[in-house]
Amino acid sequence: MRPIEKYVEAMENKDFAGLAELFTPDGILCDYCTTSASQQEYHIYGKEAINMFFRNKFGFRRYSILDAAFVNDEQAEFIANFGGYNIMAIATVRKTDENGLIQRLTVRPK
């Protein structure tokens, strides 16, 4: 399974621990969609921070994705829900290491 497919699967299942395991210890996840929902952008550094961040977001039902579709080997489109705001988004795996772990992933409004 490609890293983008694993990312979408973890997001759909709200698997914060599995999501964090997809990243290198110093992996970076940047989400720019939140500005469309009148929230601050997310810049999350490190797999432990990714785990804690999404544990909170999934646990309090403040983040989810719907209707994911793969665009290519590095990108997926979906509807991102930020606490009631739905935004069309595109996630891109920008960089992986030699083991296929994500070093950098960005999510932007489509």
Locations of regions flagged by a protein language model:
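Hydrophobic pocket/interface hotspot
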Residues: 7, 19-20, 27, 46, ...
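A solvent-exposed, acidic/Ser-Thr-rich amphipathic alpha-helical stretch
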Residues: 25-68
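Short, aromatic-enriched amphipathic alpha-helices that serve as compact interaction elements
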Residues: 1-15
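Alpha-helix boundary recognition
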Residues: 12, 20, 55-58
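A beta-strand edge to alpha-helix "cap/lid" segment located at domain peripheries
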Residues: 52-110
